[in-house]
Amino acid sequence: MADRKIYELEAMRDLSRIWLHVDMDAFYASVETLSNESLKGKPMAVGGMSMISTANYEARKYGVRAAMPGFIGKKLCPELIFVPPDFKKYTYYSDLTRKVFQEYDFDFVAASLDEAYLDITDVCNERGVSGGQIAEEVRGRVFEDTGLTCSAGVAPNRLLAKICSDINKPNGKFVLTNDQLAVVTFVSSLPIRKISGIGKVTESILKDALGIKTCDQIINKAALLYALFSPCSADFFISVGLGIGGMNSLETRTRKSISHERTFSPTNYEASLFKYLGK
């Protein structure tokens, strides 16, 4: 069964499209630095002592990361500067980048405020240029219009384009050609954690229980995956192991939410907390 499914999924491989994934570099932190140049070159994080939304690259050198409690970030980097988030500002700059994206793919898919997927097949064919050339052009336009840098990945589908955009971060690009051998070679040694859709829990199951650490090991243990997981889950694992991913079709775009939270300071007055929560 596993060999048959691999054959069927491989037959679905589409190398006819050129996808571009654009990912802004440390977006929130970069916007804040653009607004306040005194922050340039200093370790800084957007957020507070309870939670960090993002950290600039100076702070990341100390191990400070997004979704990390701020007090831990402060222990890792005592000089860390906190800046409260300003989503109006981030939305403004995000809209500027989207105006650029629309010129290359009117139906681009916005994954969040700071990243987007563009199908640049038509513009490449119409202008007789490569995906890498368009990626460089888009990056230049974004910087020209916003003053912010971004990284880009070019590949035959969205799954691979997203992986590629992370390779030469920050302020770089990586191009994976639309060639089956190139794709299979590229994907085979990828750690499974690099795959969008495989989180920490799934990674732990695959690595610790099944000894699967890379994408080629997914294919080698396909029969085991079909025996242990639902057909849908196993199909997903095999498709990403082949570098197909199931992300290359346009999806209906829905508005994503932006969370906002506040952590209360220590207090002995329980009534005041309930009063605030009742507002």
Name each model-derived stretch:
Residues V64, V183-T214, S239:
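Amphipathic, charged-and-aliphatic alpha-helical interface segments
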Residues T202-K279:
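DNA-contacting surface of Y-family translesion DNA polymerases
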Residues S130-R193:
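Long, highly charged, low-complexity intrinsically disordered interaction regions
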Residues H21-V22, A152, I198:
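Short hydrophobic beta-strand that contains or immediately precedes a catalytic carboxylate
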Residues D95, K99-C150:
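Hydrophobic alpha-helical hairpins/lids featuring a short glycine-rich hinge
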Residues Y57, A66-E79, L96-K99, I134, ...:
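Intrinsically disordered, low-complexity, Ser/Thr/Glu/Asp/Lys/Arg-enriched terminal regions and linkers
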Residues V31-T33, A55-E58, L160-N168, D208, ...:
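Short acidic, glycine/serine/threonine-rich loops at helix termini
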Residues M1-L113, Y117, G241:
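Residues that scaffold, gate, or flank divalent-cation-dependent active/transport sites
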